[in-house]
C-alpha cells in the first residue's frame, strides 16, 4: 500500500503538446505542487507531514452571520445532526449563509446537509471525523417526521439528506432514509431532496427502495481512486461496490440524477483521477464534485499534496469535456457544496418538466 501512495503524477512535457487547449492544460498541470521523494516517504499513512504546509487559499474566516446563527440555533433546538458540523466541513458558513462567504454576505439560499440515523457510524474510514462504534444507538423512530417538520419550517426549496453507515441494521437504514424523504415530500411537495447515501453493503433492494422514495438526486461517493480505496476507506467499502450502487440507482428511475465525489491530495495520480472520472461517466453519473482532502486530526490520513486552485480548474474543465453535466471543483468543495443553489436556479425556477432538459446549461456557461 505504501507504494501506491508514493507514485508521482504522470505529466507530459509542454513542448510535446499542440494547440491552445493543450498548452492551457499543461500549464494547469504544472501549477500543482511538486511531488518529492521526501513527501512520499512521510507516514506511513497518518500524522502530519512537516514538508506539506497548508496554503493561504485554504484559510477560511470563522463562520458567522445572521442566517448561520439562526440555522445553527434551530438545528440545536430540534436536536438534528448535520454533516456540516460532525464532519467539520470548511464551508459551513458559506452554505448556511446562502453562498457568498462565511461572514453572512451571501445572497443565495441556505443549504444544510441533515444527517439522519444518528451521529455514530459503524465504519472507520481513515479520512472521516465522524465518531464510530460497532453498536451505535438505535435510530429514533420519530426522526423522519421531526426532520421533515424542521426542514419545512425553514422555508427552503432544496435539502440534502445524508447518513452515517449503519451496518448494524438489516437494510443499512434505507427504509428510515426513505421514510424521511416521503415525510418531506408530504409536507412540502415542491421541495427538492438530494440523498447522499452509504453503500448499504451493496444491497440492491435497499438502493431501489430509497431511489423510488421520491428523492430527486441520488448521491454516493467513491471518495478516491481505485488504488487507494483500501487505504482511505473502511474495508467494507469498495470502488466496484460504489460504482454498482450508482449504476443501480441510475437505472431505478428514468429521470434519476446521480452524483459522486472525489477527494484529492491523498496520493492519487492524474491518470488515476481521469480513469475514475471515466468509470463514473460509463455508468451515467451526472454530477461530480472534487475537493481537497483536509486531515481532521493526526490520527487520520496524512495530506500528501495541497492541490492548487489552478489544478482544480483543470479538473473542472476536464470533467466537463468527458460529459459530466456539472462539475464543482475547488480546494474547499465538498459533496454537498451549495447543492441547493445549483439546482434551485435551474430546476425549480425554470420549471423542469422533462428528464432530458439540462438544468446546468446556464451555470456551465457562466463558469
From Swiss-Prot:
Record-linked SUPFAM superfamilies: Radical SAM enzymes
Cofactor note: Binds 2 [4Fe-4S] clusters per subunit. One cluster is coordinated with 3 cysteines and an exchangeable S-adenosyl-L-methionine.
Pfam family name, one: Radical_SAM
Database matches in InterPro entries: Aldolase_TIM, Elp3/MiaA/NifB-like_rSAM, Lipoyl_synth, Lipoyl_synth_chlpt, rSAM
Assigned protein family: Belongs to the radical SAM superfamily. Lipoyl synthase family.
Family annotation (SMART domains): Elp3
Disulfide bonds: none
Record: residues binding [4Fe-4S] cluster 1: 84, 89, 95, 336
Cofactor: [4Fe-4S] cluster
Miscellaneous comment in the UniProt entry for this protein: This protein may be expected to contain an N-terminal transit peptide but none has been predicted.
Location(s) in or outside the cell: Plastid, Chloroplast
Encoding gene per record: LIP1P-2
Record's GO cellular component terms: chloroplast; mitochondrion
Organism: Zea mays
Binding, [4Fe-4S] cluster 2: 121, 125, 128
Main subcellular localisation: plastid
Protein name (Swiss-Prot/TrEMBL): Lipoyl synthase 2, chloroplastic
Record GO terms (molecular function): 4 iron, 4 sulfur cluster binding; lipoate synthase activity; metal ion binding
Superkingdom, taxonomy of origin: Eukaryota
Amino acid at each position: 500500500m505504501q507504494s501506491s501512495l508514493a507514485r508521482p503524477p504522470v505529466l507530459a512535457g509542454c513542448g510535446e503538446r499542440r494547440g491552445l487547449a493543450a498548452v492551457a492544460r499543461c500549464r494547469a498541470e504544472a501549477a500543482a505542487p511538486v511531488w518529492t521523494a521526501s513527501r512520499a516517504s512521510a507516514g506511513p499513512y497518518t500524522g502530519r507531514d512537516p514538508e506539506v504546509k497548508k496554503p493561504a487559499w485554504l484559510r477560511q474566516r470563522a463562520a458567522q452571520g445572521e442566517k448561520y446563527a439562526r440555522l445553527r440555533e434551530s438545528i440545536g433546538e430540534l436536536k438534528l445532526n448535520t454533516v456540516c458540523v460532525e464532519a467539520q466541513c470548511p464551508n459551513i458558513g458559506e452554505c448556511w449563509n446562502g453562498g457568498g462567504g462565511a461572514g453572512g454576505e451571501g445572497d443565495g439560499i441556505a443549504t444544510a446537509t441533515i444527517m439522519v440515523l444518528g451521529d455514530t457510524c459503524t465504519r472507520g474510514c481513515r479520512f472521516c471525523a465522524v465518531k464510530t462504534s460497532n453498536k451505535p444507538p438505535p435510530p429514533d423512530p420519530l426522526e423522519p417526521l421531526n426532520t421533515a417538520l424542521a426542514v419545512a419550517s425553514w422555508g427552503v426549496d432544496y435539502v440534502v439528506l445524508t447518513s452515517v453507515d449503519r451496518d448494524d441494521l438489516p437494510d443499512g437504514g434505507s427504509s428510515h432514509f426513505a421514510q424521511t424523504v416521503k415525510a418531506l415530500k408530504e409536507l412540502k411537495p415542491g421541495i427538492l431532496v438530494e440523498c447522499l447515501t452509504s453503500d448499504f453493503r451493496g444491497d440492491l433492494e435497499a438502493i431501489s427502495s430509497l431511489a423510488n422514495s421520491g428523492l430527486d438526486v441520488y448521491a454516493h461517493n467513491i471518495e478516491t481512486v481505485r488504488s487507494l480505496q483500501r487505504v482511505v476507506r473502511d474495508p467494507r467499502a469498495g470502488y466496484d461496490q460504489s460504482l454498482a450502487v450508482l449504476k443501480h440507482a441510475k437505472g431505478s428511475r428514468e429521470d434519476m440524477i446521480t452524483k459522486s465525489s472525489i477527494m484529492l491530495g491523498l496520493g492519487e495520480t492524474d491518470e488515476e483521477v481521469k480513469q475514475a472520472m471515466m468509470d463514473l461517466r460509463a455508468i451515467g453519473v451526472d454530477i461530480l464534485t472534487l475537493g481537497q482532502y483536509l486531515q481532521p486530526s493526526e490520527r487520520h490520513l496524512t495530506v500528501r499534496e495541497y492541490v492548487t486552485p489552478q489544478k482544480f480548474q483543470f479538473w473542472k474543465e476536464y470533467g466537463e469535456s468527458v460529459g459530466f453535466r456539472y462539475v464543482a471543483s475547488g480546494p474547499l468543495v465538498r459533496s454537498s457544496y451549495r447543492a441547493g443553489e445549483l439546482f434551485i436556479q435551474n430546476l425549480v425556477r425554470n420549471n423542469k418538466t422533462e428528464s432530458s432538459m439540462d438544468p446546468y446549461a446556464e451555470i456551465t456557461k457562466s463558469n
